Amino acid sequence: MMSANSLMDYENDPEVLEKLYRNQPEKFELELSYALKQKPDSITFRIWATRLNIELSQKDDISPTLITVIGISILAGLTTRIPALFFREDWFYPRFAPFVALMAIASYFLIKNNNGYLTRLVVIFCLITICYLSLLPDWSTSSSITMLLIHLPLACWLITGIVFSNGRWQEKESRIRFIRYSGELVILSGLILIGGFGLTALTIGLFQVIGIELDDKFIETVLALGVPAIPVIGTYVYDVVLQKKIQLAATLAKIFAPLFLVLVVAFILATTVQGIPFLDDRDYLIIFNALLIVILCIALFSIVGQDQSKETFIQRCIIISLIAATVFIDLIALYAISLRLLEFGFSINRFYIWTINILILGNLIYLLVAFAYSIQNNQRTSGMIDAVTNYLPIYALWVALATFILPLVFQFQ
C-alpha cells in the first residue's frame, strides 16, 4: 500500500516513483503533499510537485499563533478552576484536570491541522468522556474507578496522538514523531513547571516584604489556572520556538541508560545473593513497577531518539543489555504479583498490575527478538524501532479496556 513513507523510502529511486504514480496517480498526489511537509527541501519531491502542479507552500500547516496559545491556556485554566468552585475539589480535579490539560493540547493540533473530521471525532470523544466521568461513583472507595482515572490520561494522550499525526496514526513515521514529541514535552513541561513554582515563590516573598500576605486561595488559583496551561505552552515552545529541533529526551536517555543498567545489574546481583524480601510488601511492589516503567521509557527513547547513522556498537550493547535486564526484573515482578494473587486471592488492583506487567514483558521480548533479527540482517536498530511502533496499538487496546470497559465489567467496585 502506498504511503508518504513509501515515497520517502524511494526518494532516490525515480523508476519506482514513476511506477507508483502510474499505478495510483490520485493517491500519489495526496501522499506527495504530505511527504513535502515532512521534507520540504527535497529536490525530488519539489520536481514532482512542479510536474503535477501541486502547491509548494505549506499554508495548511501553519502553527497556532502565540495569541491562540494564550487563549487555549486561559480557557484550559478557567475550565479547570471555575467548576471546582461549585463541586468538591477531591471529586472534580482527579476526574477532569488531566482531561482538560490533554484536550487543550489536542485543541492546539486541531487548530494547526485544520482537519474537520478529527475535530468532530475529538468533540464526540469529549462529550462522551465528560458524561462518563460525571456519572461515575466516588473513586475513593472503588479500585476499578481509581484505575480508570489512572488510565484516562493515557486514553486522552492517544487521542492527542491521532490528532498530532493528522489522522495518519497507522504510519510508522507518525508514531515515531509522536513518541519523540512526547518525551520532549515531558521535559519542557517539567522545566516550565519548575520556573512557574519559582516565580510563584518569588511573588509571595516580594509581597511579604511589603506586608501583604497572599493566602492559600491565591496559590490554589495560580496552580489551577497555570498547571493545565503548561503542556500547551510546552507544545508551542517545542513546535514553534524550537522548531522541533531539540533532542533533550534522547540525550537524557543516552545519559541515564548506562546508569540504570548499572542499577539494574546491581539489583539483580543483590537479589541473587539476598533473595527477594519484598514479595509480600505492597508498597515495595508499587515502587518496583514504577521503576520498571521508567526503565522501559528510557529504553524506548534511546531507540527512537537516536540517529541510526551515528549509533555506536557500545550504544547498541547498552540498549539491549538494559532491555534484557529489564525482562528479568519484570519476571520478578510477575512472580511477586502471582504469589499475592495465590495467597490473597483475586482483586481488581492485582489484576490490573498483573496485566500491565504482562504487556510490558511482551513489549520487551518483542524488542529482544527484533534486536536479534536486526543483528542477523545487519539492519542496525530499524527493526527495534518497528517493534516500538508496532506495539503501540496493543497498549492502546489495553488503555481503552481499562478506561471504558473493565470498570463496567467490575461494576465500579
Report residues per predicted region:
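Alpha-helical transmembrane segments of multi-pass integral membrane proteins
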Residues: 126-132, 153-163, 183-203, 223-235, ...
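Juxtamembrane membrane-water interface segments of multi-pass membrane proteins
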Residues: 53-62, 109-117, 164-182, 204-213, ...
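Membrane-interface helix-loop-helix junctions at boundaries between adjacent transmembrane segments
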Residues: 89-94, 105-227, 235-253
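Alpha-helical transmembrane segments
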Residues: 64-81, 121-131, 394-400
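Transmembrane alpha-helix entry/boundary detector in multi-pass membrane proteins
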Residues: 92-93, 219-223, 252-256, 274-292, ...
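Soluble N-terminal domains of membrane-associated systems
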Residues: 1-62
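Central hydrophobic cores of alpha-helical transmembrane segments in multi-pass inner-membrane proteins
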Residues: 41-56, 75-82, 96-111, 156-164
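Membrane-embedded alpha-helical segments in integral membrane proteins
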Residues: 72-85, 129-137, 200-210, 265-274, ...
